[in-house]
Amino acid sequence: RVMVTLFTRPRRFGKTLNMSMMKYFFEIENTEENKKLFDGLAISNKEYMKEQGQYPVIFISFRNIEEENWEDCYFEIKNIISRTYNEFEFLRGTLNQSELAEFDSIWLKKEKADWKGSLKNLTRYLYKYYDRKKVVVLIDEYDTPIIQSYQEKYYKKLISFFKRFYGDVMKDNEYLQFGIMTGILRIAKEGIFSGLNNLKVNTIFSEKYSEYYGLTEEEVLEAVKYYDMEYEMQDIRKWYDGYQFGKSEVYNPWSIINFLNERELKAYWIGVSGNSMINDLLSKGDRHIVENLEKLFNEEIIYKVVRDYTEYKFDSSDIWELFLYSGYLTIAGEKQGEEYPLRLPNKEIQSFFRKIFIEKFIGNYD
């Protein structure tokens, strides 16, 4: 069994929804109530149902941590960890004196608390409370604060914290059943994953689970029929389809849901996808980058070296990988030697290039 899996997909492609689903499936609390969520679904008559409700689950999301300095970022991280401890306040009555002091120092956000070791300690308390049941750890949007820290220049301090925080809980932790992390990018190996030799990375290139992030053609057709909007299907494909994940072609789910709600073909995803890192790297780019952007805007295919399991180093040479992993580009066919063919996935992204990239950056190089 792979102990830790990292799923990297663009923003708003279902990562958090899948993590929430796993939380409710595996969680040992409210087992019978949670089981009802899966009644009548495909998994309900599979052997996997014996795993339902069998494990303590810790679910943490870092999706909203986008602070301008390390002090504020660290403050928010501690708030998240403290709130997580608060969910498990019931453990306090079963802890010995030393463990209770550890627990309360985090719960009450004391000055010299062991924040780096706090997540592993929580798995230990849960393991003990549930009579040696190992713990499932779910970390959502792990890279949001890391990307922000690079832009705001406190990257080294943040990496120093997370290297131990994740290393303690995900590596050689006898209390861990398995861990799942999600994000957009895999951060460079000398960063937080340097010690995790048990890490399996599932990316947009991976065939396994490829259809479970984004919506398939069949799923979109079913939704469109439900809303009596089949007549829009051709335009829906042009606007929101076109992403290639593994062997699956998928639609942008955020855009589809918003389109069905508003019944208007327009760009929904680009306002929530996070563009500041891309803008930062583009501002450091050269004319060659802009010429490639022009080709893409004109619906041409460009060929670029893309590392399948990229370890992003926040360098302008990685800009095409950032475009690809963030959802602004997609694979346009088979690999040619060392290079992948890349294209814009759909009209929604084309409108983004028109409004932001072409208008803002072409003038800088004339």
Model-predicted segments: where are they?
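Phosphate-binding site recognition
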Residues: 1-366
